[in-house]
């Protein structure tokens, strides 16, 4: 990433473009996976499509990296750690995630009522989704009538719950904290794997303990990046080029792991055992490109803009595509078997264009109508609170 210059631009240790790059890649991969499931058109290499669901793991990695980066930077610079105020942290996270999520949930509820009507099961399903606990109950997780992709918000919510305690501990004693997180995932994995093939396994392999090691990799990546991202070496061209080359090598490693994941006979079993190698490769991409050559300004702005859309895109893409295909029956089709199942390649191509266009347009609309206004409200609230404390 970037262009060769005699004096490379400084490493952006506050917000590396590599984080935006990986976020766009992860969200795009998840979107490509779900859209491919509906139209069967292979617009990407097939192994990237078949293994596209692992992009969720990279989003979890990025959450840990980005949230912990201010702590890592303070630790690397010998500055006081950020103030750990759980209430303020929870308020910011809620303002960031919940408005767009609840709008999406309202739409999915309307669809569920339209398709099946009200029921006691739907009420319990809705209650779990409103409280971000949907992944903890079978009927609101794999049996949900609402938006199926939002199970990840349970994982994020549990991480946010412990982050105010975890961040200062990890900044002061990184090795023990990171080791314990990895141990939790390893022990949980060894407990869950023997249940592969049972109905219980589908409920287990994506639960929060199965991501604790992923969170550790994200926080470790932040510590490494913050420690290496300053100093005289960052002003020399050769080492920065070397980091960019290492980032490309990490991408090749990532591609090989995706190929292995896509070809696994026991896909979900391998997904659990292959999770740490995949996030280690993604973490290497993040750190190496972050320390490498800085991309040109237009590229950075484009990546930042696309990354800003990733949350709304993630929330809406699958539910929207299924709605367009089966409820609106677009592109037009009749009968009981969708055209992709009949090998209609012209329909597949048209569907691919329509589904991507709809997902992107709705994501843009939701970002500007929901996410951005509430982000502005959050900033104003924070400024008022700080002004009140200063009096």
Predicted segment positions?
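Alpha-helical transmembrane segments of multi-pass integral membrane proteins
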Residues: 53, 211, 215, 219, ...
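Membrane-cytosol interface segments of multi-pass membrane proteins
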Residues: 1-193, 199, 211, 309-310, ...
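Signature aromatic-anchored transmembrane alpha helix within multi-pass, membrane-resident enzymes
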Residues: 181-183, 235-251
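Cytoplasmic membrane-interface segments at the C-terminal ends of transmembrane helices
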Residues: 73-80, 228, 289-296
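Membrane-interface helix-boundary motifs at transmembrane edges
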Residues: 117-118, 167-175, 225-238, 294-303
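Internal transmembrane alpha-helix with an interfacial aromatic "cap," most often the third helix
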Residues: 161, 218-231
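Interfacial loop-to-helix junctions that mark the boundaries of transmembrane helices
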Residues: 47-50, 205, 236-238, 269-272, ...
